[in-house]
């Protein structure tokens, strides 16, 4: 996990360095040349790393932060605020981040749905076994898992 944190911190620093140069970006606004569309390997790498960061953030935090309204509300507010910006770089970067965030959230929801289906089938299969073959502990653990998933 510490490797992921270090990599994420680097990616987040790249993102924040982009946002802190707002005065430079205002001048760039009219030219249309900003980090997400800028030529060069380093900017292409930034775009890929930025998209990967958002997806990885959601994936790694799916059991913790996604169930807490405070961080998600603030992240959505931040992205919404930047998407309303007159600075194209802020607007487009936050829109891209919002799209990646939503895509990642849909993936998490799909995984949860698949886990629910598998759990339900396992529970039904165990319940349909004969009284001598049925494992009460297994039924109980599957029922607890079912409650966790809902």
From Swiss-Prot:
What's a Pfam family this protein contains? STAG
Q: Which InterPro entries match?
A: Cohesin_Scc3/SA (IPR039662), STAG (IPR013721)
Q: Which cysteines are joined by disulfide bonds?
A: none
Which superkingdom?
A: Eukaryota
The UniProt family comment states: Belongs to the SCC3 family.
This protein's name: Putative STAG3-like protein 4
Q: What's the source species for this entry? A: Homo sapiens (Human)
Q: From which lineage does this chain's organism come?
A: Eukaryota, Metazoa, Chordata, Craniata, Vertebrata
């Amino acid at each position: 996990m510490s490797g992921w944190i270090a990599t994420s911190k680097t990616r987040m620093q790249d993102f924040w360095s982009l946002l802190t140069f707002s005065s430079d970006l205002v001048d760039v606004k009219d030219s249309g040349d900003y980090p997400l569309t800028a030529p060069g390997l380093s900017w292409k790498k930034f775009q890929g790393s930025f998209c990967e960061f958002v997806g990885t953030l959601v994936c790694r935090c799916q059991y913790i932060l996604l169930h807490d309204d405070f961080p998600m509300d603030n992240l959505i507010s931040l992205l919404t605020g930047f998407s309303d910006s007159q600075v194209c770089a802020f607007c487009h970067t936050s829109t891209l981040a919002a799209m990646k965030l939503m895509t990642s959230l849909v993936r998490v929801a799909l995984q949860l749905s698949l886990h629910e289906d598998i759990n339900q089938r396992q529970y039904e299969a165990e319940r349909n076994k004969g009284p001598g073959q049925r494992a009460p502990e297994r039924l109980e653990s599957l029922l607890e898992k079912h409650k966790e998933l809902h």
